[in-house]
């Protein structure tokens, strides 16, 4: 099985400059390849098969970064095309804007060019980078994704191939009803119902986030104070995201640990978000992310996850009747 482990990185200033260069080159190659594909199709009505290597002569700066990072940018573009042709509602591949797209790149482990030694991880082209490894893992490193968030912190997600652990069958079956007033109401086969409220810390953090947003809006554009206020706001939102992830991971772990069969309703967040009165509340509760976590954790642990039809009136039927 494949499992990802995410850790904080503490690069030097030289390494930060290299990462910034990688982020930019990956974005450049993705956009250039997408643009050339579009123009070629307009002229010939055929798909262009282009690769990052053919751009290195025209743009020599691409030779300064990890070639595997550029190859993965190509794979991401090809995947975006496949998703579009498979389901048009996904949308045509978009160009990546510098300040809106995620600053990240992915590289692969080839011949042991990625390894961990003495609290540092060795990466292609840049060497050893200091890493805070808060937990150990076993298995073969397949790839790594380097990223930088809005507050300027660096992270690495290490994809590892390892043997799947043997989980014992759980005792119960459970149904999950998602909501807004309460995040979820669960009922198991023993008739035990539990309400899980949205964590109060989120509301407190969101108030501080709104205050930081107002402070940013009052700063003069282009000033250093505005840059400082933007960093403060980014850190506030980062804290909110981390609190939400912690809540979702804790709850999804509890449910998949204790139950062999899990039934959850499939809600179309995209359609529900069209209701402007509910849009923010629905966005805050993160139903999709919770369902995603349940799905992969259920697969890891040998549980059965059943997604009930979204038109089934689960919210209108009591646990005794349904």
Annotate the PLM regions.
Residues 1-72:
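Gly/serine-rich nucleotide phosphate-binding loop at the start of the catalytic core
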Residues 2, 105-107, 137-140, 169, ...:
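Short solvent-exposed loop/turn micro-motifs enriched in small/polar/acidic residues
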Residues 4-8, 128, 143, 173:
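Well-ordered beta-strand positions in beta-sheet-rich domains
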Residues 7-9, 129-133, 196:
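Generic detection of short hydrophobic beta-strand segments and adjacent strand-loop junctions
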Residues 50-149:
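Acidic carboxylate diad motif detector
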Residues 150-322:
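Positively charged, helix-rich recognition surfaces that bind polyanionic ligands
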């Amino acid at each position: 099985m494949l499992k990802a482990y995410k850790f904080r990185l503490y690069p030097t200033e030289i390494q930060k400059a290299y990462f910034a260069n990688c982020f930019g080159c990956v974005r450049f190659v993705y956009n250039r390849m997408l643009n050339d594909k579009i123009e070629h199709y307009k002229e010939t009505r055929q798909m262009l098969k282009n690769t990052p290597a053919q751009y290195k002569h025209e743009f020599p700066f691409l030779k300064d970064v990890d070639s595997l990072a550029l190859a993965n940018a190509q794979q991401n573009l090809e995947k975006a095309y496949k998703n579009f042709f498979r389901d048009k509602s996904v949308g045509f591949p978009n160009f990546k804007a510098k300040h809106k797209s995620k600053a990240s790149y992915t590289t692969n482990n080839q011949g042991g060019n990625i390894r961990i030694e003495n609290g540092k991880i060795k990466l292609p082209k840049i060497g050893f980078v200091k890493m805070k490894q808060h937990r150990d893992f076993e298995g073969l490193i397949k790839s790594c994704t380097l990223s930088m968030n809005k507050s300027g912190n660096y992270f690495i997600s290490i994809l590892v191939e390892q043997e799947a652990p043997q989980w014992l069958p759980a005792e119960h079956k459970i149904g999950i009803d998602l909501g807004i007033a309460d995040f979820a109401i669960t009922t198991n086969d023993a008739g035990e119902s539990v309400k899980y409220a949205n964590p109060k810390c989120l509301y407190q953090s969101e108030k501080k986030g709104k205050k930081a947003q107002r402070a940013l809006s009052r700063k003069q554009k282009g000033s250093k104070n505005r840059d400082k206020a933007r960093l403060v706001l980014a850190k506030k939102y980062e804290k909110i995201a981390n609190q939400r992830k912690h809540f979702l991971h804790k709850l999804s772990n509890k449910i998949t640990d204790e139950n062999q069969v899990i039934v959850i309703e499939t809600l179309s967040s995209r359609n529900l978000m069209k209701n402007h009165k509910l849009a923010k509340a629905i966005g805050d509760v993160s139903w999709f992310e919770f369902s995603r976590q349940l799905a992969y954790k259920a697969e890891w642990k040998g549980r059965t996850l059943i997604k009930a039809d979204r038109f089934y009136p689960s919210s209108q039927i009591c646990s005794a009747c349904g």
